[in-house]
UniProtKB/Swiss-Prot annotation:
Subunit structure: Monomer.
InterPro entries noted in UniProt: eFR1_2_sf, eRF1_1_Pelota, eRF1_2, eRF1_3, Pelota/DOM34_N, Pelota_arc, Ribosomal_eL30-like_sf, Transl-rel_pelota
Gene Ontology annotations of biological process type: nuclear-transcribed mRNA catabolic process, no-go decay; nuclear-transcribed mRNA catabolic process, non-stop decay; RNA surveillance
Top-level lineage group: Archaea
Lineage: Archaea, Methanobacteriati, Methanobacteriota, Methanomada group, Methanococci
Name of the encoding gene: pelA
Similarity comment text for this entry: Belongs to the eukaryotic release factor 1 family. Pelota subfamily.
SUPFAM superfamilies: Dom34/Pelota N-terminal domain-like, L30e-like, Translational machinery components
Cofactor: a divalent metal cation
Enzyme class: hydrolase
EC number(s) from the headed UniProt entry: 3.1.-.-
Function: May function in recognizing stalled ribosomes, interact with stem-loop structures in stalled mRNA molecules, and effect endonucleolytic cleavage of the mRNA. May play a role in the release non-functional ribosomes and degradation of damaged mRNAs. Has endoribonuclease activity.
PANTHER family: PELOTA (PTHR10853), PROTEIN PELOTA HOMOLOG (PTHR10853:SF0)
Protein name: Protein pelota homolog
Chief place of localization: cytoplasm
Amino acid sequence: MKIIEEIPQKNIIKLMPENLDDLWVLYNIIEEGDKIFAVTERRVQDKGDVIRADRGAKRKMFLGIEVKNVEFDENTKRVRILGTIIHGPDDVPLGSHHTIEIKPFDELSIEKNWKKWQIERIKEAIESSKRPKVLVVVMDDEEADIFEVRDYSIKEICSIKSHTSKKLDYKINEELKKEYYHEIAKVLSEYDVDNILVAGPGFAKNSFYNFISSQYPELKNKIVVESISTTSRAGLNEVIKRGIINRIYAESRVAKETQLIEKLLEEIAKKGLAVYGIDEVKKALEYSAIDTLLVSDSLVRNHEIEKIIDTTEEMGGKVVIVSSEHDAGKQLKALGGIAGLLRFPIE
């Protein structure tokens, strides 16, 4: 996510989403009554079109709408913002209905009464865009190429050689192999990422993973191992074409949310540090007991929920918006769509 411009005196922020996660942020922060300004397409009839019963030609124009509804389509990578026109060219009637579609790299201006948690979601999206999406290690017994993959760029970090050889003694080769693995692991340890893909032909990738498991346990849970047919840049291209990176990244986000819901259910089962449902969450807030508030994305536009989110953040609690598209999100929805992990037990 990028902030293009801010006009604080008018409560306007101009944004450019860069990926699917940014669109999901927009979907969650745009609400009924907000004003959206963007370049969009609309059919416009001239007098001749009316006489011929022609629907008119589509034309690009800059429009402003007052939001009535927002939809998120993950498959087409679009946020659809439905509303009534409040600003536009003279030949476009004010008050008529229009839908603005936003996809990655489209710019839009949002005018609204901004809530603290909405600003925080934007800041988190901006920080996320600065971090690598995933590190990719394409390797075999002889060489490892390490890449930093972002949503819109790929950077080669380094290439590391093993210096092993069939001409060398077995023990020497084993020592060289350990040094090779250590060197790769040290590079990976320098990066703040949640996902590391280790890919390659043969058994080197599995041997490296076993080495990581024993020598660098802090990296173990970040690593996913995949088989590919070749190494170097061609191997990276194979990884991208097969959609492996996108799958890992999507699974990672779902996994984080699933872990939180599992922890919630465990605490509920033992009547421990958890509450669920609006009434119980409100009660916990009265004691400043909520450490992490879990909210279904289906409820973020509910005014009562918004107040709970605001209060939680004012008290130093963390707020996690959980997607209702996966099983754990559906479990949260079944619990009333809102729950809290507590700092301490309450009566």
